[in-house]
Amino acid sequence: METLQFDLTKEYGKFKPLNATNGGPWHKRFTKKMVRSNYEEYKAARIPYSRNHDLAVHTVYGGPYCHDISCIFPNFDANPYDPKSYDFGCTDEEILTTLEAGTKTFFRLGQTIENQIVKHNTFPPKDFKKWAVICEHIIRHYNY
């Protein structure tokens, strides 16, 4: 392994931030029983970017109720034009907390892979046009 060395007597200019995360900070704002929070440390780290890939497996963000299309739109037989068909609660909170900590979010629009024996939500949709409408409404929600 190579060692990165600097001559501190020379000026090199600004360093590009290289730190980023998958998932934002843990915050106790709405989860008072949460054992721990890393919000202040996360904010102090000044992390420029975070993505929310496969966060449905992390209970701290809402577990099976956040980020995946099947979590945000849990009943595929529901009307995709009815705002009541969508559950943005946990996903909104994770994104809001991340933004409040000063971190920009890369939103992953998709579905968490299921490596278990039984698959529940990783099958192709039964109606691709409806799936596209659902995706469109999720994108619109986060680009208001």
What is each residue range found by the language model?
Residues 1-144:
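Non-catalytic accessory regions flanking glycosidase/transglycosidase catalytic cores in CAZymes
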